[in-house]
Amino acid sequence: HRRSSAASDVYKRQIYRGVLYAGLMITENGPKLIEYNARFGDPETQVLLMRLKTDLLPALIACADGTLDQINLDWDRSAAICVVMAANGYPAEYKKGTSIKGLQKAGKIEGTQIFHAGTLLNQQGDLIANGGRVLGITSLGEDLTMAQKRAYAAVDLIDWTDGFCRRDIGWRAI
């Protein structure tokens, strides 16, 4: 059973150039489309950007110009994983302004990048939480097990008593 949406009817009449993010859920009856957005997905983009060796800007310009077929993208063959650190209480009520420390040590884990989402520097220059999903700890590894170990090793170095993360990221694929 297929359904159409008002947005899909608009897309049938227009040429779309840009990013299209599809949120999917795998069910016992196969994949189901939950949502689609004209933007990059979060945290899906973090793992893609970690693996992308090519400069992203020329690809985005080519996409807008309609010449994306002329761009060659070079990808790192490593596995990648992103563990989101969120404020306690998220997605319901959560506190802003809580202190986050240890990112310098965490960022030194091999193959790891820390992406900021809901952070800011307060007047004293200290990093604080300013949203629900706050950090995306993203790691590469020769396989998913190694990437997962690196990401959680980095998470464990972050001192943020008012934050949490899921500890099951990647387990189905491993």
Which sequence ranges carry the predicted segments?
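Residue-level preference for beta-strand/loop junctions
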Residues: R3, Y16-G18, R77, G131
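Conserved metal-phosphate-binding beta-hairpin within the catalytic cores
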Residues: K12-D42
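Glycine-rich phosphate/pyrophosphate-binding beta-alpha loops
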Residues: I34-L48, G89-P91, L120
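Peripheral (often C-terminal) accessory segments that flank ATP-dependent C-N-forming ligase machineries
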Residues: A62-I174
